[in-house]
Amino acid sequence: MLDLGLSKMALIGVVALVVLGPERLPRVARTAGALFGRAQRYINDVKAEVSREIELDALRTMKTDFESAARNVETTIHDNLREHEKELNDTWHSAVGGLDGAAGDAGSVGSPGSDTPAAPSWRGSSAALAPKRRNWRIKQAATPVWYKRATTRRTHVQSGAARVARHQPASLRRPTRFF
């Protein structure tokens, strides 16, 4: 910070002794030392804050880069999946359409004016494959047993010594005498 050698420090000390006197010099030196320490702590705090902000900015940029890369991967996967699904549906419809045309029914299969149903999809019925959704209200309404035990009001309070005595085997108990 400052380039103060031993000779410069001694010169400053002598000037301070002459100007302030021997009575006030120790008090001023303590105050100056405390102020210097505070200044150093403040500078170190500012440096640490700046370095944290720089790290946060770097992490934010990394996060945005990662999110954009994930979005790009997701869109490419979805595009490829849609493309392959379209090809599969086209192949399926051409195969099913060829079988229906060979069966002898004239006209287009599944047209709005005809009574013939549309060609089935290769996936089958969507209702049969739909996952059964459970009723989450049942799960939400059930209170866990551990919570019931932890929060219930105790009707029979027992001290630690009484609890130990209650669960101690009879062979280890001391005989009780009243007189």
From Swiss-Prot:
Membrane protein topology class: Single-pass membrane protein
Q: Where in the cell is it found?
A: Cell inner membrane
For this record, an example GO cellular component is: TAT protein transport complex
Keyword Methyltransferase found: no
Q: What are the transmembrane regions?
A: 1-21
Q: Which organism is it from?
A: Burkholderia cenocepacia (strain HI2424)
State one Pfam family annotation.
Answer: TatA_B_E
Protein name per its UniProtKB record: Sec-independent protein translocase protein TatB
